[in-house]
Structures are given as structure tokens and as C-alpha cells.
UniProtKB/Swiss-Prot annotation:
Residues 660-680 have a biased composition (Acidic residues). Residues 1-11 have a biased composition (Basic and acidic residues). It comes from Porcine astrovirus 1 (PAstV-1). Residues 1-72 are annotated as: Basic. This is Capsid polyprotein VP90.
Length: 776
């Protein structure tokens, strides 16, 4: 701003909050509300200046410099920049239009830690490095440069529009609505530049934005630049669709940073693309909208590796990750038609935000899939407000959801832990347990059959159609009984929820001669004598109705603790549906050595005894609102006797090679006293009589554990109560000898050594040599 010589230039900046000042209010009160900055510039040069430029007006540049200096001093422009960096970032290519509709080709976020290309090269540049070191950022200017990759005469039918979205929030804006924004139209084949000023990109804090994306979304992301195409891209030379890239997109900008605050983890946020990915959407009325992708897809692999989950076990199995991902679909396809209402517009808009669900793998169209909760904005994802469906998709039914192909460009938006991972000073003790064992907690249900009553469990003796067998590389096992698995949840030996195991290689379910399912886990236990009990957790991939001509039912005689089979009254059919999970059991005899997997292809006979095992509740409790816990292996490996029961709690049991410290004895006594009240409610063990067999003790533990779990007791707590209520003979001997030795004056090390030696003698496991680490 300039003026004539000899006159003043006055700049007045008013920052008024609310309505104008009332005359009745005092002057002091009005000054507290309104902040006015008055700058007066004398445009008449001084003596020294007049000698050099006599009679010439001041330049606009000098006036702007003085105004900016005064505004900075008054504090209305926020903190002073600590560093300024100008850089050019290559963002990737702008693809062609394949549908003729408005397609989103790119969504460019201006936050410096998110300025990366989508080629999977996640090395950081100077802008990302500075963004991870400072808490505030703003942009002085920004240019989006479009370099054509094809000639103007090579393709026809498509126009490109780049527009500014100040809120970086998905919307259902059409082509006309994009024209109402700050935008530029680009002709294919010609270079173009989209210029934006600082006033277009200013943030809510005197023009500044926050860098850490873990903070509120409306003050961190900054504006976004969306690039859309309209019209099918056709090749002028081949008279067919053109599928290549149209432009190379580059971002040129100058960032300013202030407020040093190092967050090193923000350097490694990932950005990549997954072309031609299979995507589907689930959701029923009142439930969150979920995106389902193949478990072996690039997006799911990256998201699984980088996601951070809240520790603990959710009741509904829907533990959400704390890591948020932006998903951009650059291929408008049938995806929007398979979305439950009312969020078809969200998918049609081209991008949304998701969080990964833990332990929610499903079988869909013969493939393992993972689920992600969808959010309509980044702020909704931070505050965990998912998109809630008001109905289901028109073509939706269980296990048969339609999938669509999509080109997914995904960006990791945040990192829950922003510091450098250091060596922990406290370690958690894990018990030594094989990695191949898992525990399945589920609600059993009788499979629908064609005879009455339907709730009764039937065992198949003779098949007439679609005989069920599990086939492996070295044999087959005939299925005698089927139970439907509802609400499955998988746990590790430390009672931490884990994902569903993958298919066992080389093992499948046959219906006659046709493969109809995959086996994800197996159970086999050697019972008394030569008897074995086998079970498979199977996911059926095809609908089938196995038919049996003769059947068996279960009975229990008086004073007999085991089950027996008796002849059934009629034939029956099982009804198995694709996408469902079933527990398929088989019983028989074996002649192989203990520890080897046994294949049993024989029919079950009338009068066969089924001895008590963890499978017994699955045979008896086949309806009701309760859950059963069953151990299983990820391969064809029989369960050892110590793995059959889920109530082992070795964290509180010292190893035989290391004696407990003196304070550990006191802790154990305190735990015993604290558990007295719980044990009184479940006093199922009579210590006054003879010692029960260890196998009966284990069976009683399982029964008590299931009872406690059904009554709402935590799994770990139920396991501890069951273990203390039914100790084995070796455990009783070890504790008795240990306490007697302490009373006799022995030290803790010597007492524990004697106790372990006595326990090994009771269990017939005498070691070859004694441990050298314990003095007698």
C-alpha cells in the first residue's frame, strides 16, 4: 500500500469477538474484548532518503514489510517460524477414468509427515524429517504440478479437475460441486499448475496447524487437494479404453515449522497401494460398517504389521486397533452397490478411514479375510465413532457377500507411540509352551437334522450319501459327530486373544469325493487302553447334506462316569452350510505308538465307550447360553497329557530346577487365603477320602472351569480356582514335602529340591541325574 508524498498510511487490524460494543459498557471492558492493532507509516522520506530518491513514493514492498513486522510484534500471526524448508515431492501418477463417472484419482494431504508417494517407498525426506521434530507447521505457498505422460492426441474423452478441500473430510460432492471449490480444470496432454496461497491453507491457530496426527483431526491434517476425472478415457489409436497414467503429479511447497517437539516414530508412517484388491462391506442395522479384505492382500499384511491393539479381551471379539488408515479407492466399481445403507455415498466419494479388528478372520468365497471398522472422517476415527448402518445391502446374506475389485491407495495416518522404542526395564514372564497349541472358546449348537427332536445329538454309523471324512497326506478319518461352532474366540496358552489359525496344509474335509471344507485346527487324545478321541475344527466352503441310514445316541449308566453309544431309532440328514464353522469328532481304537497321529476310518459301533475328555461337554451341552473351552493344535499332532486341559497355570508354579524364594512362599500362602472364599463356592473335592486318579482330577478341573466361565468368571481366574480345587497327587505330594521340610528346619532350596524329588517319584518320572544347583 502506497500513498502520495507527505501523507501518512494507516493500517488498522480489528479482531472483534462477538457483537459490537454497547455504549452502556465501560471502556475498560470493551478493550478486554477487542484487540485492535493500529499501524501508522509516514510515507514522506527522511533527509537521508530524500537525497537519494527525492519526491518518489515509497514502494509497496516496503509498506508490506513494515505491516508484517508490526503484525508479528502484536502476536496476531502466531509464533515466529523456527525453520523454513522448500521441497518438491513426487506424489505418483494420475490414472485414467474407466467408468465414465466422477472418479477420485488422488487425495493429497498437506501435513508434512504425510507427504509421501504411493509407490511403497517409505524413505523420508527433509519435509517429513522436520515434521517429526516440530509441533507446528504452515505453508507459505503450494503448487501442484501436472506433467503429462501422454500426448494430447493420444487419448480423448476425459477431463481432470483438481480442487481444494479445506477440511480434508469425505463428502458426496459431485462434479458441479467440485467446481464451486477453489479448483483448476486440466486438459489431458497439457502441462498445468494448481497454485495455492498461504491464505488458502491457513490453520486454526493463527494460521498454524499441529503436526502430531494423534491430536484432533480438525487441527492436524490441514487442507487436502483432491484430483478427480470425468469421462471414460479412450485411446485415439486403438479405439478402445486407455488404462495407462495421464499425469505425473508433483507437489512444490514451502513449509514453516515452529515449536520443537521430537516425535521420531512419525518418520515411519507407511503409504502404499494395492491394485485390483477384493473388497466387500458388512453391516446390519445398528452395527458398524466393516470393510472386508483378503487376509493375504498387501493392504492387510501392512496394516496387520503396523497396527497397535489395546491389550485385553473384548467380550464381542471386536478389539479395535489404535492405528488409523486412510483408504482411497481410485477405481469406481460395484463397491458402492454392495455397501449397507446409508453409507453408499462414503464409498462413492472415493476415500474413508478404517481401523483393523483383531481376531475377526472369516472365510469368504473360499478365502480367509480380515475386517476393518469404517469411519466417515478422521476425527470420527480418533474419537471411535464408527459409521452405523441402518440396514443391510440388497444382495447380502450370510457367507455370500458380493465382493468388488478396487485399487486401494492406503496411508497410515497416525502412530500411537511417537517415541523411540527403548529396551524395557520390566519383563513379563511367559511359561514354556509350544507355539502350535491354541484354545478355542465357543458356544456349541446341535446341527439341524431332518428328524425330531432336532436338539438331540446323533452319531453317524452308516452313511448313504456324502460321507464325511477328513483326508490327510497319509490317511483319512471318518466323522461320527458334528457340532456347530458359534461365537468362536481363539486364545494363546497365556490367555491372550489371537487370530484364527490358518488352514492346515494338506488336510481337507471331503463330502463323498468332493472337497467341501478346510481344517484350521485339530485335536487328538489317547484315552484308556487303545481308545482315541479325535476332533477337527472345520470351515465348510460348500453347502452339503450328508445322509445316514443308521445312527447312535449317547447314554450314561448308573454309577458309570463315561458315555456309551446305543442304537438310534431312525436315519437322519445333517445340514451343513458354507461359511459356517463346525467341530467334527471321531472315536475309535488304535494300534500305533503313543505320540503319533492316528487316522481312524472305521464306523462307530453300538456299545462303544466314550471316556471322559475335554470333548465330553461338546457331546452333552449342545444348546443353551454357555461356552466351552477346547484345546487344539495347529497341525496333526496329538495333545500331550499336560496339554489336554486348559487349567494349567505354570506362572505361579516354580520350575523344578529353581527353588522359590522365601518371600514367594509367603505370597503363595496369601493367595491361598484370598482364594478361600472362592473355593468355598466350588468345594467339589473331598480331601477326606482316597486320592482320586489324576485323569479324574483333570476331568473335574475341566468341568469346574466350564461352569465358572459360564457364570461369568474370568478365564484366568477360573483356571486358578479349578487348579486349586482339584490338585493332582504329585502337586499334593510336592507341597506337603516342601512344607514338612521347612518345618524341619531346611532352607527353601533344599526343601524345594526334596519336594520335587518326591513329586517325581509319585508320577514315575525319576530324573537320571540330580541338579547341581541345589545343595542338600
Amino acid at each position: 500500500m502506497a500513498s502520495k508524498s507527505g501523507k501518512d498510511v494507516t493500517v488498522k487490524v480489528e479482531n472483534t469477538n462477538g457483537r459490537g460494543r454497547s455504549r452502556s459498557r465501560s471502556r475498560s471492558r470493551s478493550r478486554a474484548r477487542n484487540k485492535n492493532v493500529k499501524i501508522t507509516i509516514n510515507s514522506k522520506p527522511g533527509a537521508s532518503g530524500g537525497q537519494r530518491r527525492r519526491g518518489k513514493p515509497q514502494s509497496d514492498k516496503r509498506v508490506r514489510s513494515i505491516v508484517k513486522q508490526q503484525l508479528d510484534k502484536s502476536g496476531v500471526t502466531g509464533p515466529k517460524p523456527a525453520i523454513r524448508q522448500r521441497a518438491t515431492a513426487t506424489l505418483g501418477t494420475i490414472g485414467s477414468n474407466s467408468s465414465g463417472k466422477t472418479e477420485l484419482e488422488a487425495c493429497i494431504l498437506t501435513n508434512p509427515i504425510l507427504v509421501k508417494d504411493n509407490t511403497g517407498n517409505n524413505t523420508f525426506g527433509p519435509i517429513v524429517a522436520l515434521g517429526a521434530q516440530y509441533s507446528l507447521w504452515r505453508i507459505r505457498f503450494l503448487r501442484i504440478k501436472f506433467t503429462p505422460m501422454v500426448g494430447q492426441s493420444a487419448v480423448t474423452g476425459t477431463v481432470v479437475r483438481a480442487s481444494l478441500n479445506p477440511t480434508a473430510t469425505p463428502s458426496s460432492t459431485g462434479w458441479s460441486g467440485l467446481g464451486a471449490r477453489r479448483h483448476i480444470d486440466i486438459v489431458v496432454g497439457k502441462a498445468a499448475t494448481f497454485n495455492l496461497k498461504a491464505s488458502d491453507l491457513s490453520g486454526p491457530r493463527e494460521g498454524w496447524w499441529l503436526t502430531n496426527t494423534n491430536d484432533s483431526g480438525d487441527s492436524t491434517l490441514g487442507p487436502s487437494i483432491e484430483i478427480h476425472t470425468l469421462g471414460t478415457t479412450m485411446s485415439a489409436y486403438q479405439n478402445g479404453p486407455f488404462t495407462g497414467g495421464l499425469f505425473l503429479c508433483e507437489l512444490q511447497a514451502e513449509w514453516e515449522f515452529s515449536g520443537y517437539a521430537a516425535n521420531p516414530a512419525l518418520l515411519s508412517l507407511e503409504k502404499n497401494r494395492d491394485d485390483d484388491a477384493e473388497v466387500s462391506f458388512d453391516g446390519q442395522q445398528g452395527e458398524p460398517l466393516t470393510m472386508v479384505v483378503a487376509e493375504d492382500s498387501l493392504f492387510n499384511k501392512v496394516a496387520t504389521r503396523r497396527s497397535t491393539f489395546t491389550r485385553g479381551i473384548a467380550r464381542d471379539g471386536q478389539t479395535k486397533s489404535e492405528t488409523i488408515w486412510q483408504v482411497v479407492d481410485t477405481a469406481v466399481s460395484a463397491a458402492e452397490t454392495v455397501v449397507p445403507p446409508p453409507f453408499g455415498w462414503l464409498i462413492r466419494g472415493g476415500y474413508w478411514f478404517v481401523k483393523k479388528l483383531a481376531g475377526r478372520t472369516k472365510l469368504r468365497n473360499g478365502k480367509q479375510t480380515s475386517s476393518y471398522v469404517c469411519y466417515a472422517s478422521y476425527q470420527d476415527a480418533l474419537s471411535d465413532k464408527p459409521a452405523i448402518c441402518t440396514g443391510v445391502a440388497a444382495n447380502f446374506y450370510a457367507g455370500r457377500t458380493e465382493t468388488a475389485r478396487a485399487n486401494l491407495h492406503f496411508t497410515q495416518m497416525n502412530e500411537p507411540s511417537t517415541g523411540v522404542g527403548e529396551t524395557p526395564t520390566a519383563f513379563r514372564m511367559y511359561r514354556a509352551a509350544p507355539d502350535d497349541i491354541v484354545y478355542l472358546r465357543f458356544k456349541p449348537e446341535t446341527v439341524n437334522i431332518s428328524v425330531s427332536p432336532a436338539a438331540r445329538l446323533f452319531l453317524a454309523r452308516k452313511y448313504t450319501a456324502h460321507s464325511l471324512k477328513v483326508k490327510g497326506n497319509s490317511g483319512t478319518t471318518r466323522i461320527h459327530c458334528v457340532v456347530k461352532v458359534n461365537d468362536p474366540m481363539w486364545y494363546s496358552p497365556d490367555w491372550e486373544q489371537v487370530a484364527q489359525p490358518g488352514p492346515i496344509p494338506g488336510v481337507s474335509l471331503l463330502g463323498g469325493t468332493t472337497t467341501i471344507g478346510i481344517v484350521t485346527a485339530a485335536y487328538q487324545a489317547h484315552m484308556w487302553g487303545l481308545h482315541i478321541a479325535t476332533a477337527f475344527i472345520v470351515q465348510v466352503t460348500k453347502d452339503i447334506n450328508p445322509a445316514c441310514s443308521t445312527s447312535c445316541v449317547l447314554t450314561k449308566e448308573l454309577n458309570d462316569q463315561h458315555l456309551k453309544t446305543v442304537a438310534g431309532q431312525t436315519s437322519f440328514n445333517w445340514s451343513l452350510r458354507a461359511g459356517e464353522t463346525y467341530l467334527m469328532m471321531s472315536f475309535g481304537a488304535h494300534t500305533s505308538a503313543v505320540g503319533e497321529w492316528v487316522w481312524n476310518d472305521a464306523d462307530i459301533s453300538v456299545g462303544y465307550t466314550i471316556y471322559n475328555s475335554p470333548l465330553t461337554p461338546c457331546l452333552l451341552l449342545t444348546e443353551g447360553s454357555f461356552h466351552i473351552v477346547l484345546p487344539a493344535k495347529r497341525g496333526l499332532i496329538p495333545l500331550a497329557s499336560t496339554e489336554l486341559f486348559t487349567v494349567r497355570d505354570q506362572d505361579s508354579i516354580p520350575q523344578t530346577t529353581e527353588p522359590p524364594a522365601e518371600e514367594d512362599v509367603g505370597d503363595n500362602e496369601t493367595e491361598d487365603e484370598s482364594d478361600d472364599e472362592d473355593l468355598d463356592h466350588f468345594d467339589l473335592h473331598d480331601s477326606s477320602g482316597s486320592e482320586p486318579e489324576d485323569e479324574d482330577v483333570e476331568n473335574n478341573r475341566v468341568t469346574l472351569l466350564n461352569t465358572l466361565v459360564n457364570q461369568g468368571v474370568d478365564l484366568a481366574r477360573a483356571a486358578k480356582i479349578s487348579k486349586r480345587a482339584y490338585p493332582t497327587l504329585a502337586e499334593k505330594t510336592r507341597r506337603s514335602v516342601f512344607m514338612d521340610s521347612l518345618i524341619a528346619g531346611c532352607g527353601p532350596s533344599s526343601a524345594w529340591s526334596e519336594a520335587c524329588k518326591a513329586a517325581r517319584k509319585v508320577s514315575f518320572k525319576e530324573p537320571i541325574s540330580e541338579s547341581r544347583g541345589h545343595a542338600e
